[in-house]
Every structure is written in C-alpha cells, then in structure tokens.
Design a protein with these regions (language model features):
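A conserved ligand/cofactor-binding region detector
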Residues: 1-209
Length: 209
C-alpha cells in the first residue's frame, strides 16, 4: 500500500500452478503438504506438464474446454537443475557385455529427464521439502536410424498433456512412456542421492521408504 499497489491486482497476474490435478494428483499434493506441515522430511516427483488439466469457459450456456497454459508467463518458484539430469531409455534391447561383466541397454531411444525443484513449505515449521518436476528434453546421442523431427515430437509429447487420450494404441503408448519416464527419472535420482552418501546399495532399504 505504501507504493500504491494493490496486492490483489498482483495475485491475479500469477497463474495457478498446474499441479495436484485429478484424483491421485490431489491426493499426492495433500501428502506433500501434510509431510511439510507435520515437519517430516519427504520429497515428491512428478512430470512438469506444459498444460494442466483444462480451463473452463461458458459460452452460450455451454462449457468450453481450453488448454491450461499455466507456464506461459513462467513459474517463479521452480529452480532448474540441469546438472542433475538423467537419461531415460526407451525401446532397444538389453545384452550381456562379457568384456565389462554387466548388462547393457543398446539401440535405445534416449531422452533426458531434467529436474525443476519446487520448495514445499510447512506451516510454522523449520522443515522445507522438495517437489521435483521432471521435464523431457532431447539427448545429444540421437539414434542415426530415427527421424529427427519425429524424435523431437515424441520428446515434447511426454510433458505436453496431463491426461492424453488413451483410446488408441498410440495414446496408450504415450501414457506408458509418461509413466516409465517419471518412474525411471525418480528412481535414478534416489539411487544417485543414496550413493553420494553411502558406498553401496546394501543399506538402501534402511534409508528410504
């Protein structure tokens, strides 16, 4: 008020984050909020969707659904952390490498999962947790037998819509790729964090829930 600015005018400029939508999304958001408010350490993982659920508009008495472009003006609470990116590999095959004595994933389509961290702050607590949003980005290791434009479209589609139409085989494949991308990135990050503090995974079950 000292500067002649109405806080309510500023509030209207910031879009609601397209997070915590849908039944499971709402439940997960409540878990994250409760963990922080009860002062328990905890971290969440999700996909950094370009579009949220949808925006509703009424025209001539009928509902009209519009894309929820919640990041069109940026999201000030997130911090991009490219050095913590992890590769997520689709398709290809797994073979045993005798020379290295381990299994290897070859001929795969690689997509990078880049994290954006958002703080989750509790009410009257000293604990701040993290919600990690994973964004799909193309890999420099592009397969020579793939169409580049199609590859870029496949990468972008992973983080484009929260609930893509899965009534077709292509839609079902996209939903599966979204789930695999999210799980692979999250698990890789957890394992890497563990190995920064401990020499092996022998005590992994004791440190993570």
């Amino acid at each position: 008020e000292d500067y002649g600015i109405n806080i309510h005018d500023l509030e209207e400029l910031e879009s609601d984050a397209g997070l915590g939508n849908g039944g499971l999304g709402r439940l997960a958001a409540c878990f994250m909020d409760s963990l922080a408010s009860l002062d328990y350490p905890g971290h969440g993982n999700t996909i950094r969707y370009e579009y949220g659920l949808f925006k509703q508009k009424i025209e001539n008495g009928y509902q009209v659904e519009l894309p929820d472009q919640w990041m069109k003006t940026g999201f000030m609470w997130e911090v991009r952390k490219p050095k913590h990116r992890v590769p997520v590999k689709f398709f290809g095959k797994v073979i045993w490498d005798e020379s290295e004595g381990k299994w290897k994933h070859v001929d795969a389509e690689t997509i990078y999962a880049v994290p954006y961290d958002v703080p989750v702050i509790g009410n009257d607590t000293v604990n701040t947790n993290t919600l990690r949003l994973w964004s799909a980005e193309p890999s420099e290791d592009f397969p020579s037998n793939h169409d580049f434009q199609r590859y870029i479209e496949d990468v972008r589609s992973i983080c484009q819509n929260l609930y893509p139409d899965d009534s077709t085989p292509a839609g079902k494949m996209l939903r599966l790729k979204q789930e695999y991308f999210f799980c692979s990135a999250g698990i890789q990050a957890i394992i890497k964090a563990h190995l920064r503090n401990y020499p092996s995974l022998d005590n992994f079950h004791e440190k993570h829930v």
